[in-house]
């Protein structure tokens, strides 16, 4: 049976094993996909071990995407531009690196959300590693404009210069977006994981605009709340991108097309159930705390009496 894996730290939470094993079931592929916890110090020997043991492909997640790019025999143009690798393909003597993140985003937007990016005004919030992997695939779709924002101006300016041969990028800070409207807003910062949101101007959504967050679950809710407050009716999380970037890797490895829609639906249901369970637990704990506080208060009053 052919073997594949995702490596990172932490990696126990990864949905990649479910996604790829489901793809294998759908397409009758004789393969097994697993998650392997790998720290920074173990990265090089682990990649050698996986190659020696005959693994045919490996997905890379945090914190190794940048480091792995330098360890590959060759890398694709899009991986080189992204400065990061999320997919390894076995060669006779090592690994070839690729990056399917941007392809996953574009396929989710165009095929699952049915938005044509060509001719649209696109805004990408954030100019870090996550955004960098999206820029060439977005530019390849020929948007009317692509604006890249960040807290500090130098990062968008640097990326605009780097990607100049592939298309025009308008760099600016978050606060400099005023008076413009966009058809597609992509949130590519990690702010949602800390319960915050980049400071950007109001009234920047064009009619029918899609607001898209690379995050999902609780980290998605901050951006979603902002989008709803701006009147957005089309808001999407990053689960579709996660599933589609995995499908892109699966096609490279196996040469077959999986059914991504079924997996996206299943994952959305799973995430919703987990969040509902967590909310129930939190509510239960809150009630217990409230009851304990009331009991303590009653004891305090009784003692004072």
Q: What spans do the regions from the language model cover?
A:
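Phosphate/diphosphate ligand-binding glycine-rich loop within oxidoreductases
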Residues: 1-113, 218
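Conserved S-adenosyl-L-methionine
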Residues: 140-145, 230-233
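Phosphate-coordination loops involved in phosphoryl transfer and adenosine-cofactor binding
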Residues: 1, 118-121, 207-208
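Adenosine-phosphate binding glycine-rich loop
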Residues: 119, 214-281, 285, 302-305
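NAD(P)-binding Rossmann-fold cofactor-contacting core
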Residues: 143-163
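Rossmann-like adenosine-cofactor binding region
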Residues: 166-235
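Glycine-rich adenosine-cofactor-binding loop
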Residues: 8, 99-102, 109, 113, ...
């Amino acid at each position: 049976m052919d073997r594949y894996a995702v490596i990172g730290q932490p990696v126990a939470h990864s949905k990649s094993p479910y996604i790829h094993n489901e793809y294998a079931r759908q397409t009758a592929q004789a393969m097994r996909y697993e998650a392997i916890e790998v720290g920074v110090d173990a990265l090089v020997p682990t990649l050698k071990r996986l190659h020696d043991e005959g693994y045919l492909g490996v997905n890379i997640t945090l914190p190794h995407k940048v480091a792995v790019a330098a360890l590959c025999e060759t890398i694709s143009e899009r991986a080189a531009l992204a400065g990061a690798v999320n997919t390894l393909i076995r060669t006779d003597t090592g690994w070839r690196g690729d990056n399917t993140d941007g392809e996953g985003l574009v396929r989710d937007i165009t095929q699952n959300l049915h938005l044509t990016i060509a001719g649209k005004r696109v805004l990408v919030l954030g100019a870090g590693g996550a955004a960098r992997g999206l820029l060439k695939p977005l530019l390849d779709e020929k948007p009317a404009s692509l604006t890249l924002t960040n807290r500090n101006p130098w990062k968008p300016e640097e990326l605009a210069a780097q990607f100049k041969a592939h298309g025009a990028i308008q760099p600016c800070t978050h606060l400099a977006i005023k008076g413009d409207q966009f058809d597609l807003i992509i949130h590519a910062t990690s702010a949602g994981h800390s319960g915050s949101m980049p400071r950007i101007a109001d009234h920047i959504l064009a009619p029918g605009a899609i607001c898209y967050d690379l995050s999902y679950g609780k980290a998605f809710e901050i951006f979603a709340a902002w989008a709803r407050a701006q009147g957005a009716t089309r808001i999407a999380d990053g689960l579709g991108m996660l599933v589609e970037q995995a499908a892109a890797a699966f096609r490279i490895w196996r040469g077959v097309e999986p059914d991504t829609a079924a997996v996206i639906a299943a994952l959305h249901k799973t995430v919703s159930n987990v969040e509902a369970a967590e909310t129930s637990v939190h509510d239960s704990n809150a009630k217990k705390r409230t009851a304990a506080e009331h009991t303590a208060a009653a004891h305090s009053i009784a003692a004072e009496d």
